[in-house]
């Protein structure tokens, strides 16, 4: 059962009849992503019994194929992950540091060291249950066989066409013929990226940052004029750290630690931060998953700016990220759980620029503390994209009161697996 937009989970009715392909009986969880194809992948993972961590990993690799302007394999980011059984919440951080300097400062270009694959590898080890290959395969299929260009990617292409048009490899990937870029609804095939994702699927994430593929990637970036080295890839690690936490009655609110934007989200949640407005800038993407056991994962990944370094590494299909730690402050997922039962009460992400962390905190405050309907709170956001699931009585305690929603502009999508 696919449920889009903002709704009460109790309002779900089966869109597919029993005994028909695609029918899902019972509640399996909910997902939100900034791009619809990725949300569909996350929903399918949950419907097949996967965990919230599995769904988040699969959505990231799907996004790498469908929204490379914000979430390519060249990205970095941060996730918050909660286990209901142990009542523990942790932050998995994988900021993308600058790679080495270009060999020729006049003709070369600077890139960030890609860390998102390393981050997803760690997330899967700690919070996954499904086989790694089955999660990566969804993104591989979207790249190899093609997927319809979403409104989200079409918007980014319209804003960034002139920026990426200066790179021959990028022009080739986005060109649908006669120098015209793919647009909304066009089926978009990326064979090089499909091959890269197949390598990650078969050899595991470790090959991307310290194996044979890592060496190939570093060599290809250097041949194109960048400064990425094998040492850069091996040294840019993902880590498990303590998130920021704040008491909310009998609950705990969890925020991403610095250098990410958690402090800004925390301030807005407390009522002392910025508003919900601001222009959309792009370059980041948020996604979240909550499974039927009450486990939750919320992530934000980013490219440093829209389309990152605006360079695609030939032969890999990877849009490289741009260096610059300032973009970390724009990434800020959030969770709220009950410290006695471990039940999840809220999961949220935001993307789209400097105002995104404050927008997330404000929507969380309005829905959880002021009991504003989620649809109303999301409708007031101007610029950033906020995705959220909020359960006033807790997901396991009373999921029928949960609300789930993506931005009302139609760029992202919220889906529920089951009823």
Regions found by a protein language model. Give the residues of each.
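C-terminal motif of bacterial Sec signal peptides marking the signal peptidase cleavage site
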Residues: 9-11
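Proteins synthesized as precursors that undergo proteolytic processing into mature forms
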Residues: 13-171, 194, 204, 224, ...
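Accessory "access/gating" subregions that flank catalytic or transport cores
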Residues: 30, 46, 161-258
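Cofactor-centric catalytic regions
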Residues: 385-419
